[in-house]
Regions:
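A generic structural signal for solvent-exposed, polar alpha-helical segments
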Residues: 35, 39, 112, 129, ...
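Active-site-proximal cap/loop segments of hydrolase catalytic domains
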Residues: 72-367, 371-377, 386-387
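Glycine/threonine-rich phosphate-binding loop and adjacent beta-strand/alpha-helix elements that clamp
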Residues: 8-14, 23-27, 36, 57-73, ...
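Hydrophobic, aliphatic-enriched repeat segments that assemble into extended interaction scaffolds
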Residues: 1-3, 100-107, 113-122, 225, ...
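Catalytic-loop region of hydrolases
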Residues: 2-123, 409-423, 428-430
Length: 606
């Protein structure tokens, strides 16, 4: 937890910024804060909406601008258009240090004491007016009520199920006092205080839960780790748990533009933690970034976790499911994008059973739900298996096999080539590929690892952006189609100077890197590296091909990559070299999942 802070004068503070002296893990840091965007006025919002209508749709900048709208402070209670639901607007909660934050609380008109769903994230407690087609992308109009805010539960649904919904503006957001601290111990501590305050209200049964996806879930993971006594359970849907490894520096490669995109979208009257500038100031892992890692061991409450196979929150979701200490935890890994998945009726009914069990004490058979349910993707919009029940993840019957790469002909096989070879490519403009054709039906579900022997000619560093994609028997690309757009498949990242492994967390199937030191490459040096892949689940039919694609830059193909993937590479003018065969065995380790049952030609996969 951060200690008491003081504003200081630092040499690298830009105009309009302040620096605060803060302590994390016994280390003292100068943390930079930028002056926030106060949010759009009603008039500015209407002008943005008018221009968007004239041009046939809102641009990314216009959509972000509408997200930054903050309604004027106006505490009152009113009857919503839902008729049987009231909203208590701008309810004040005083935190332990005296800071006041505000929440909008929706609740059904009833004399029965009810549980509360808390939503704690910096995106604002108000529904983002004018953003319907963006914030609910992939969700048909009128699926949710006008009271649903960004990436959060819909009061129009949950209040009618006997729950209150409390949308919170955290410290520094909107009209709440203080400065914004993004996804660290201060944010988590404030969430603890709010939960204990709201569950003490006379209309509450003393139990709270949390649900929301993406940035909302990221905040909720951290709050759950503080163990509020009245937090009964959590539905952690699509949230990262390690900001350094999963957002700021994927594989050690900085991605500050996405953080700028997030900051620009928030309505902040005071100051906000300037994470893009902090990334420049502290490029290596330290206690500042460790403060933004969820302490999974402290989460002991029942948890319903979801992970989308095609989204950048994937790693954090599985890390959370695997590492929390709760004996009551469930995972649903699906092929949808996060937003439509969150509002599908069958998924709402599913999580309602979970909430009813642990927030209302209803014995509804929830414990019979399979601990793990996975979609196994095939091609385009089709799945080989949907919601297949499993016991754990990685799957117990997983068999790890190595596909050895051959630079001589661009092939891959289960035997290491005896002869050494190399392939050279320009990281700025070219890629290199290695292809294997399956001789039998094969399911790959779990963690892949790419082990390479690499050399950089003409520079002392190299960034690797590998993908694993699917081709048909004739070599034609077979994408996964998500919301109408093609998606390639499994991916990984690594800056080779960050190749050092974190031996506390790394395993044979998941090479977790420490990022605590930089090891530049020497001329002529061939360096072994292991690239961590995000989890994946896909089926290859006999005759189809698996192709490893390696690039020196992130190649954008999906629509959402425009906002979340814009890495700052460090390849210089060097040429990348992949060595294979002999003593320089390079391979892709794949998690092959055999059938659950097989007799002769009969195969059952579940």
């Amino acid at each position: 937890m951060a200690e008491e802070v003081e504003i200081i004068s630092a040499e690298d503070v830009k105009p309009g910024e302040i620096a605060k002296k803060m302590t994390f893990g016994g280390e003292e840091f100068e943390v930079l804060f930028a002056k926030g965007n106060p949010g759009k006025t009603r008039e500015e919002l209407e002008e943005i909406k008018r221009k968007a209508a004239e041009s046939g749709g809102a641009s990314d900048a216009e959509m972000v601008a509408t997200m930054g709208y903050c309604a004027p402070y106006n505490p009152h209670t009113y009857l919503t258009e839902l008729q049987d639901v009231i909203c208590e607007r701008d309810q004040a909660c005083t935190l332990r240090d005296g800071t006041v934050i505000y929440a909008d609380i929706y609740r059904p008109i009833t004399t029965e004491k009810i549980p509360v769903i808390c939503v704690f994230a910096p995106f604002g407690k108000n529904p983002s007016e004018g953003m319907d087609s963006w914030q609910l992308m992939g969700v048909p109009p009128k699926t949710v009520s006008q009271y649903a805010k960004f990436e959060a539960p819909d009061p129009g649904y949950w209040c009618r199920q006997g729950y209150a919904v409390a949308n919170v503006d955290p410290r520094g957001v909107g009209n709440s006092q203080g400065d914004v601290y993004l996804w660290g111990s201060q944010d988590a501590e404030d969430g603890y205080d709010f939960i204990e305050w709201v569950t003490a209200q006379d209309w509450c049964n003393g139990k709270a839960t949390m649900i929301g996806n993406s940035g909302v879930c990221m905040a909720h993971w951290r709050i759950a780790a503080t163990r509020p006594p009245h937090l009964a359970c959590i539905a952690a849907w699509e949230g990262q748990g390690d900001l350094y490894r999963e957002s700021y520096f994927c594989g050690g490669i900085p991605n500050p533009d996405y953080e700028t995109h997030i900051i620009d979208a928030l309505a902040v009257n005071n100051y906000i933690e300037d994470t893009p500038e902090m990334m420049k100031k502290y490029p290596l892992m330290n206690s500042y970034y460790k403060d933004k890692i969820v302490d999974w061991n402290k989460i002991r409450i029942p948890a319903y976790v979801t992970a989308g196979w095609v989204h950048h929150h994937l790693r954090g979701a599985f890390e959370g499911f695997r590492r929390i200490r709760s004996p009551k935890k469930w995972m649903r890994a699906h092929r949808d994008f996060e937003w439509p998945d969150s509002y599908k009726p069958e998924n709402l009914e599913d999580v309602k059973r979970f909430f009813d069990r642990y927030c209302k004490g209803i014995h509804n058979g929830w414990e019979m739900t399979p601990r793990v349910r996975i979609d196994v993707m095939d091609g385009y919009e089709f799945d080989y298996a949907s919601a297949r029940p499993e016991e754990t993840f990685p799957l117990k019957r997983t068999e790890y096999k190595k596909l050895y790469l051959n630079a001589a002909d661009g092939s891959a096989s289960f035997e290491n080539p005896a002869t050494e070879a190399e392939v050279v490519y320009d990281p700025k403009t070219e890629t290199t590929t290695f292809t294997y054709q399956f001789t039998e039906d094969t399911e790959i579900t779990g963690f892949m690892k790419l082990h390479l022997n690499v050399e950089c000619r003409g520079y002392d560093n190299m960034d690797l952006f590998p993908w694993v994609i699917k081709l048909d028997k004739d070599g034609n690309y077979v994408p996964i189609r998500v919301m109408g757009a093609p998606y390639r498949g499994a991916w990984g990242f690594l800056r080779c100077s960050h190749r050092d492994l974190d031996l506390k967390y790394a395993s044979d199937f998941q090479p977790v890197h420490s990022h605590e030191k930089e090891e530049r490459m020497q001329p002529g040096e061939i360096v072994p590296v292991d690239v961590e892949f995000y989890p994946h689940s896909r089926f290859w039919h006999k005759g189809e091909q698996l192709q490893v694609v390696i690039a020196g830059r992130f190649i954008k193909t999906e629509w959402f990559h425009d906002t979340d993937m814009n890495h700052q590479t460090d390849n210089g003018d060097g040429m990348h070299v992949i060595h294979t065969g002999g003593e320089h065995d390079s391979y892709l380790q794949i998690p092959v999942v055999p059938p659950k049952y097989q007799v002769g030609d009969y195969v059952y996969r579940g």
